[in-house]
């Protein structure tokens, strides 16, 4: 069956044909391919086409597709049962592995998705602080729970309004919007409102890759300390991706609560939130903050997470290799674009990378919105045709995996050069056509005057 036909069938029974909106490729104006399998750095569609994959399931697959060690752990555990609805030693083992890297985090609880992790972290922070009002930052995505699906109101100091149908305005009104990398926007809100919680992606990966400035995070931490505000660092994406210590290894900033996901599950549905003992002990059954989940901590997912982190901790120079490849890709892409007269900004944090077609530095959501999305769509479509799978949205992040080498990066850059060549030629043709049409219009106008 063809990609088109299979997607057409999906459209009949699944809203939009997908189970997560970005997979529909609407942001780049094309139709998605349907995946048959993945192996290492590559995925294959149902037509047999092969793609070098820089999406890597949106981050979890740091060792690439179908990693043998992780697969073996999953298969072995699955033979004993998929889920028990009771605790197993695997939960404790994975908890200890994660906490061993963060000496200020005392306890952790597992859930099944990043949305659950941030939603639970917000509830926990509110329960601990006794305050309902929170601050989030424009462009930071923390899952699709109601209180976090907000957009800016009439200004940075106003409360948010819902950005999705079905979210009550009263729910959104307890969420205030600040500007990423702008500490004054935070101060303006904190001075006027009784804020109990601030949540942030220290390395924003959902408006494209936009890292926080270190000085901004230092000042944010200081405000939280002075005002006794609970600071949640959302590291669902950046945890064990930007480095073994996530954002902490880069900035040295400690969150009161930290959320994890993606890599800690090795490709299975695992996320978590962790914090200091006095905060975490507020969760039931110890405290009054309720949180539960049927499949939370299921043994198969725990086994995948243990295998993933064990392999990470045993891999010497893993993150150095991944960051070198990410820099090689982004620096190369920037140089190629420059040679074609195309404005581009690039960013790298560990194995994460992003690019914007703009000549302006991207520091926040408004900067990201000003980038040339039409150029992005052209580039993405061209790369797909050349067998390179990049995130099908300007507002997503790309990922390097351990199965890649300089060979794959050079291949991707070679294809990028070809795509930019075609874009430049197409632009030149259109410009020439416009010029000819303009001359004809002028001649016709002169003739009519005579």
Curated annotation (Swiss-Prot):
Family annotation (InterPro entries): 4pyrrol_synth_GluAld_NH2Trfase, Aminotrans_3, Aminotrans_3_PPA_site, PyrdxlP-dep_Trfase, PyrdxlP-dep_Trfase_major, PyrdxlP-dep_Trfase_small
Alphabetical keyword list: Cytoplasm, Isomerase, Porphyrin biosynthesis, Pyridoxal phosphate
Source organism: Campylobacter hominis (strain ATCC BAA-381 / DSM 21671 / CCUG 45161 / LMG 19568 / NCTC 13146 / CH001A)
Main location: cytoplasm
Localization per Swiss-Prot or TrEMBL: Cytoplasm
Protein name, entry field: Glutamate-1-semialdehyde 2,1-aminomutase
Catalytic activity as recorded in UniProt: (S)-4-amino-5-oxopentanoate = 5-aminolevulinate
Gene Ontology MF terms: glutamate-1-semialdehyde 2,1-aminomutase activity; pyridoxal phosphate binding; transaminase activity
Gene Ontology biological process terms in this record: protoporphyrinogen IX biosynthetic process
Entry cofactors: pyridoxal 5'-phosphate
């Amino acid at each position: 069956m063809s990609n088109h036909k299979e997607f057409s069938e999906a459209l009949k029974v699944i809203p939009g044909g997908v189970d997560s909106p970005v997979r529909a490729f609407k942001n780049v104006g094309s139709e998605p391919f349907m995946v048959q399998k993945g192996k290492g750095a590559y995925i294959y569609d149902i037509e047999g086409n092969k793609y070098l994959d820089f999406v890597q399931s949106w981050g979890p697959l740091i060792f690439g597709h179908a990693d043998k060690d992780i697969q073996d752990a999953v298969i072995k555990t699955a033979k004993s049962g998929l889920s028990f609805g009771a605790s197993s030693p695997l939960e404790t083992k994975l908890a200890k592995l994660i906490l061993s890297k963060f000496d200020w985090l005392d306890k952790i609880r597992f859930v099944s998705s990043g949305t659950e992790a941030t939603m639970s972290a917000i509830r926990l922070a509110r329960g601990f602080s006794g305050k309902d009002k929170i601050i989030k930052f424009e462009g930071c995505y923390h899952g699709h729970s109601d209180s976090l699906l907000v957009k800016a109101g009439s200004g940075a100091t106003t409360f948010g309004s819902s950005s999705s149908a079905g979210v009550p305005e009263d729910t959104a009104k307890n969420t205030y919007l600040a500007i990423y990398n702008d500490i004054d926007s935070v101060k303006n809100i904190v001075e006027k409102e009784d804020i109990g919680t601030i949540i942030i992606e220290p390395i924003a990966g959902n408006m494209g890759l936009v890292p926080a400035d270190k000085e901004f995070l230092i000042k944010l931490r200081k405000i939280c300390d002075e005002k006794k505000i609970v600071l949640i660092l959302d590291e669902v994406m950046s945890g064990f991706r930007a480095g073994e210590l996530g954002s902490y290894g880069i900035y040295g900033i400690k969150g009161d609560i930290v959320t994890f996901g993606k890599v800690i599950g090795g490709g299975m549905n695992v996320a978590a939130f962790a914090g200091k003992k006095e905060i975490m002990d507020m969760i039931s059954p110890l405290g009054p903050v309720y949180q539960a989940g049927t499949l939370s901590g299921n043994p198969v997912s725990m086994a995948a997470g243990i295998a993933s982190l064990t392999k990470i901790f045993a891999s010497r120079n893993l993150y150095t290799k991944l960051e070198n490849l990410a820099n090689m890709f982004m620096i190369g892409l920037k140089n190629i674009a420059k040679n074609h007269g195309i404005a581009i900004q690039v960013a790298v944090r560990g194995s994460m990378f992003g690019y914007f077609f703009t000549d302006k530095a991207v520091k926040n959501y408004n900067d990201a919105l000003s980038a040339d999305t039409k150029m992005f769509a052209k580039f993405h479509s061209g790369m797909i045709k050349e067998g390179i799978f990049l995130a099908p949205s300007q507002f997503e992040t790309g990922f390097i995996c351990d199965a890649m080498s300089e060979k794959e990066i050079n291949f991707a850059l070679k294809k990028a050069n070809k795509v930019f060549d075609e874009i430049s030629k197409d632009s030149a043709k259109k410009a020439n056509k416009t010029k000819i049409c303009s001359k004809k219009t002028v001649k016709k106008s002169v003739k009519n005057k005579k």
